[in-house]
Amino acid sequence: MLDTGELRERFQQHYGIHPHVIVRAPGRVNLIGEHTDYNDGFVFPVAIDRATCVAARPRTDRIVRVMAADLHDEDLFSIDQIERSNRAWHNYIRGVVLALRTAGHTLSGADMLIASDVPRGAGLSSSAALEVAVAYTFQVLNRLNILGEELALLAQGAENTFVGVQCGIMDQLIAVFGRADHALLIDCRDLTYRAVPLPPSVAVVVCDSHIARTLAASAYNQRRQECDAAVRALQQWYPGIRALRDVSEDQLAAHQHELPEPLRARARHVVSENRRALQGAAALEAGDIATFGRLMNESHASLRDDYQVSLPDIDFLVTTAQSLAGCYGSRLTGAGFGGCTVSLVERSSVETFRHDLAQAYHDATGRTATIYVCRASDGVGRVMDNARPQE
């Protein structure tokens, strides 16, 4: 957990004055429903207790100054002249400010200091946490009236258009609407959601493989293009469909031999994953943890074989986790090509599970995994207001 008191003091040291506000936006781990959000589908994430915090004060001019405490790097730009930077982290912030300006919001400049304990490049949505935290900070400093849904869409738009990653809406929505001790079943078409309590007897265990992947440079955008191509191909038989979310498994099976690879496999994953997300949420609501775990295992097999976003070392982590006592299910989480796995584990077995998984991974690969239990947390909000902690 980030120490907001320390963040306040670091802001004071850097800018010579205390911050007006400190905002926190969480990372996320998706329990099931992977690569479905940009297909108008269903996802089932939790906001986690790792977050990005922004300490900030308003300025009287139109200049934005940003210090990234973790990177020991700075950015400075004018709200009136926002251009792309050759520093990747700059563009997430600049893109959000540009999105707010383009939406017609009146903005003043700001001095900001940013810190995060969401691992970068691990698939826990460090980028969305940053985008949402920055957007919410500007909302607070400028007394804007932006609904949570609009805030998430602005943040997503910044990543799509300014950063150049065609992400879906899940990461930004869970960063905004996350609820402590709950997962959210989100409909990524109409942006409605339902909070589902997490059973207290199980723990959400995340394993960071330390196989880093840069989302913008990966095959993520290619997968999205393949899904769009699959929709266009299926529209010759089903002209009413707008996205793979509209296709049933029976409809896909009826024309699977007429759909070329890899489009057939990509569509098969998305269509079946939507079913698994809905069934998984219903299973947890009913207290059927075993069924949820089985669906997690099926999800990973689909990501590995049909969506082809896993790697051999990730598969090793997943199959090892699935074999350990107390583990109900395990899968790749996030965009893939490295990053993290998520497992649902009986609380009484967590410490043995962590030790055995870390040991097996190190023995097999020589790498040291970081394994931690995630607590489902609330979405974006203020943790300090006018330099005072929130009650």
Swiss-Prot record:
Example of a GO biological process term: galactose metabolic process
Chain positions recorded as Mg(2+) binding sites: S127, E159
Principal location: cytoplasm
Keywords attached to this entry: ATP-binding, Carbohydrate metabolism, Cytoplasm, Galactose metabolism, Kinase, Magnesium, Metal-binding, Nucleotide-binding, Transferase
Cellular compartment(s): Cytoplasm
Recorded GO MF terms: ATP binding; galactokinase activity; magnesium ion binding
Active site, per annotation: D171 (proton acceptor)
Record-listed substrate binding positions: E34, H35, T36, D37, Y220
Pathway participation: Carbohydrate metabolism; galactose metabolism
GO-annotated cellular components: cytosol
EC number of the protein: 2.7.1.6
UniProt site positions, description: Transition state stabilizer: R28
Reaction catalysis annotation: alpha-D-galactose + ATP = alpha-D-galactose 1-phosphate + ADP + H(+)
Residues binding ATP, per UniProt: G121, A122, G123, L124, S125, S126, S127
InterPro entries reported in the protein's UniProt record: Galactokinase (IPR000705), Galactokinase_bac (IPR022963), Galactokinase_CS (IPR019741), GalKase_N (IPR019539), GHMP_kinase_C_dom (IPR013750), GHMP_kinase_C_sf (IPR036554), GHMP_kinase_N_dom (IPR006204), GHMP_knse_ATP-bd_CS (IPR006203)
Family: Belongs to the GHMP kinase family. GalK subfamily.
Function description: Catalyzes the transfer of the gamma-phosphate of ATP to D-galactose to form alpha-D-galactose-1-phosphate (Gal-1-P).
The name this protein goes by in its record: Galactokinase
Organism: Roseiflexus sp. (strain RS-1)
Gene name tied to this protein: galK
